[in-house]
Amino acid sequence: MAIEIRLMRNEELGAVESIYAKVFGDQALDYWRRRFEWQFRTNPATLSRPSQLWVGVREETVLGFVASFPARLKVLDTELTVLCPCDLMVSPDARREGLGERLVRAYIKEAGRMAIALTYSPANARLHNRLGYHLVFAEPTFLRPLRGSRVVRTMAKRWFARTSPLNRVLRLSTPVLGGAGEGVIALANTIRSPRAVGNLRVEVDPIFDTGFDQLWREASKEIPVIFARDARMLQWRFREDPITRHTVFAARDSSGVPAGYAVVCESKRHNLRVGKVMDLFCPPSRAKEVVGVLAASFLRYFLSKGIDLITAKGLHPSIRAELRRFMYLKAPGKETPAQFLLSRDDPLADAVYSADKWHLSHSDGDEDFVP
């Protein structure tokens, strides 16, 4: 019997949760339940466009689904409320039937003017290429190790994990590599330490007041393509998140108005404690003044928390260039590509398809929604 693609009915949420648990496990399902109300219903952007969740159904059995939530995107002088897809998954017993592609096509049809994809796997990338998406850029991820010995030992264990006589010998050298790595990284971090200059002061965990609306208005004039970062969106994204605890650093000038901010959180990866710079935002014209002040603050914070490694991703080119002075390593492997489906005849296409026009960060994806 043919599979029907349609919007989820309320009584089918349990079946959707069962598929999620099959793919990611019961613990991840608990996180997904906790963020469902927040991400899909209390999101401020739902005031102008509702979240949507499509299911693939055969004989009343849900076999797969794709969800999407709205987000406000500014492109040049135009603000769009776009649908952002997430959680595309198919039940393991219904794969190789083209269901994933049909679900994405349903999303594209509803998305209208612009469809979005952050493709986290080669299979997803191939699917979106086939559907006509254009690669905008692969978000660069950059790193700063803090506890060199732990980082080097952990990475060495992964590199030498495969069983072979040579790897067994190399594994014995892991403590030596860790000690050497500690010294090299300590020296590099000393050389690449941020120094606060100017008269900016940093406030930790400020209230997102009207000053952040003013910052958004001023900074967004200099950034052609960016998702909304006004006070209400910041409150929802970083204060009301039911899963992740975020810490905010705001740089203020003598008038008290924010000149920029950084948002960070903590996670674990490969037995390492990872500090993530979720966003670092300021007018690009003030990046040289603001980034160093904020970086000095969140580096001290991460050191006090015993973080092993710091990561950041994307950002506007001017902001990224300043941050790269202090986060000097690039992550190995392929980056997560950002892809968009927008007619080349659309007057906004040139801006959307130009990587140097964007400010995109960890916070614009959903990586921290499930720790």
Feature-to-residue mapping (PLM):
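Non-catalytic N-terminal targeting/anchoring module and adjacent flexible stem/linker
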Residues: 1-11, 346-347, 370-371
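Hydrophobic, well-ordered secondary-structure scaffolds
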Residues: 83-88, 102-111, 120-127, 145-146
